[in-house]
Each structure stands twice: as C-alpha cells, then as structure tokens.
C-alpha cells in the first residue's frame, strides 16, 4: 500500500526517517539515564567489534553493543523491543525538553483542519490535494484526496472566501459543517 497514492500519507514511513528518530531517542535517553554515556559510545563499541575486523552485523549485535556500552542488558533489550523491533515511538517531548527544545502545538488557540498544504485553490475550486492524515479534522470529516470543498459552516468556499478565513472565525474544538463533492457526488 505504500506505493498507492490514495493513502500514502497514512501508510508509508521511510525506515531512514524512523531510524533517525529512534537513534535520536536513544541518544537522548542515554544522556538522561546513564551518566556520561551517549550514542557515540555505542557506535565506538560497534566499531571496536565490527569495524576494525570488518565483520558484518545485525540488530542483535547492535543491541549487544548497547548493553556493553551501558552495562545494562535489560535496558538494551527493552529499548530494542519497544523501538527497534516494535513500533513504539520514544517520548520525544520529555527527551527533547532535557535538551532545551519544547514541543507544542504550532498555533495554539487557532482552529485547524489539518495540514494547510493539503488544500489548494485550483481553477476557482478548493481541492484536497493529498490524503488527510488519520485523526486530523479533515480525515474525521471524511474528506479525501481529490475532493472539492464547497462550503464550510454554510459559507461557500471560493476565491473570495477562503478556508483560512472561515477557520479564523472559529476556535479549536468548534464543530464546523463541511459540504464537499467527492467522486462526482455531494
């Protein structure tokens, strides 16, 4: 399903992106839980055991290097089970806070339908350009890629009345009626 454009945004995640996120989570977890230990220590351990002798390695070898670097095989096993073999995401908000980065709502107090780049005015019509992300207000309303938004809260959406203008008159949590055309029908 990852190559199917009809729901790609909800089904595809690059393992490069995921791996970078898991590594960031691991580095920050090490920095907060193990005095003086960082991901660099794990990478040096991997180099010592696999780089100099040029030996191939697998996930279990990296887990073992983490266990040696931290001296805590239970931690290594639980981290790998949750985030490498599993599908959980590290607790980025609390981990990044330790690094001085605060995660929060992009526009608190402002109404939102989903990524504003999902909707574009094309030829006088407001078109949903990409599949709405699962859980977003557009997704919950039933909008899909290629749908044409006709009205929001009874206001016709056209060149004179934009989606942004209607949303600015509302607050987060407001329920806004959406009239739209999907696959030729309303």
Residues covered by each model-derived region:
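Generic recognition of flexible, low-complexity loop/linker segments
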Residues: 9-13, 64-66, 138, 165-166, ...
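Residues at alpha-helix termini
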Residues: 69-70, 99, 141, 170
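Extended alpha-helical interface modules used as scaffolds for assembling large macromolecular complexes
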Residues: 91-98, 103-113
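PDZ/PDZ-like domain segments forming the peptide/carboxylate-binding groove
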Residues: 108-151, 155-159
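Active-site lining segments that contact anionic ligands and/or coordinate catalytic metals
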Residues: 23, 80, 124, 173-175, ...
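Amphipathic alpha-helical substructures
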Residues: 2-97
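PDZ-domain C-terminal substructure recognizer with occasional recognition of PDZ-binding tails
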Residues: 144, 150, 156, 161-186
